[in-house]
């Protein structure tokens, strides 16, 4: 039971910072694994710095986010996040992202995301 609370606390801290666009990276492991956003590249990006670059780009298009649902089972979790986006072309869209997490040794270790990539392609320049 202790591990479930720890994973939930890590996620709560991550999303609190993520919504503010600051302080979220403190709960990530240094060898953090991120998979998502490009179905043609299923291998994960490795490292907190590589993930930070992804989030720096992503932060330009999301205005707000909130956790819609969180299910935690030991070191595993699934979060449905609702994001409000404003794209460079002016389109404003609210959408959900499924986020599958793994924690290890008191840090968030891995994240795999699933979302509507076609909407992103249609609304962002190449």
Regions found by a protein language model. Give the residues of each.
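Hydrophobic/aromatic beta-strand elements that line small-molecule binding cavities or substrate pockets
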Residues: 51, 65-71, 82-85, 96-102
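Short, cysteine-centered beta-strand-loop-beta hairpins and adjacent loop/turn segments enriched
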Residues: 60-61, 85-93
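A short, polar/proline- and glycine-enriched secondary-structure boundary/capping micro-motif
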Residues: 90-91, 120-125
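Short beta-strand edge/turn micro-motifs at domain boundaries
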Residues: 99-122
């Amino acid at each position: 039971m202790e591990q479930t609370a720890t994973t939930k606390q890590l996620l709560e801290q991550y999303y609190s910072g993520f919504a503010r666009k600051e302080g979220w990276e403190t709960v990530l492991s240094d060898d953090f694994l991120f998979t998502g956003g490009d179905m043609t590249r299923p291998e994960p990006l490795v490292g907190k710095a590589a993930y930070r670059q992804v989030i720096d780009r992503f932060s330009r298009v999301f205005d707000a986010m909130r956790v819609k649902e969180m299910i935690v089972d030991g070191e595993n979790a699934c979060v449905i996040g609702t994001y409000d986006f404003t794209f460079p072309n002016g389109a404003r869209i609210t959408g959900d992202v499924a986020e599958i997490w793994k924690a290890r040794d008191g840090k968030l270790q891995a994240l795999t995301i699933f979302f509507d990539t076609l909407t992103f392609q249609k609304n962002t320049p190449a």
